[in-house]
Amino acid sequence: MERLLFLDACVRGPELSRTWRLCQRFLEEYTTLHPQAQVCHRDLRESLPILTGELARQRDGWIARGEDDPRLTPAREIASADLVVVGAPYWDLSFPAVLKVYLEWSSALGITFRYAEDGRQVGLSQARALVYLTSAGGPVEGQNYGFDYLKALGAMFGIPHAYCVAAEGLDIQGTNVQAVLRRAGDRAAALARQLAQEPMCLQG
């Protein structure tokens, strides 16, 4: 059974978040075509503690001793997922802090990556792709640094493909918001169909 990890950083919640609408369109399309997929929904508003130096040392100790502390859950989820879907609004050229906190806990030596003998980082995640869904009040204009970061981090974890669907310009006066969201939703649904129908033959 395929495991789909949905990291929900739609901090305004389902009622107000425009990013949430894109996420739902993607997930509905994907699970319709791939009904055997097990969706793990992580609401990142239920925030983890900030990873301080002391907590990082504790985490390294848990891993070294083979302990299963709940705060290792983010790393284990990323490592065991077959598909990672991230929903986050475009804030300050990036994404909300709750997502960064989760990702810092995910970056765990021995779980999501390791070092080879020559010092290279080797990813340990089995995920075949990462999907980033976002919405922005203005134009992104090539400054989608949140996606750039996620793509690089995913590669470090061994995730070979990354895709982004963005609804842009939603707060610009005169914008037909519903039309923009509908077009972005169509792109999200098309990507979901691609990933559901060609799980082992991705191009990206």
Please provide the spans of the model-predicted regions.
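Short, glycine-/small-residue-rich phosphate/pyrophosphate-handling segment
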Residues: A116-I159
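Structural beta-sheet core signal
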Residues: F6, V86, L130-Y132, C164
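Flexible, glycine-rich phosphate/dinucleotide-binding loops
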Residues: G13, L48, P139, D171-Q173
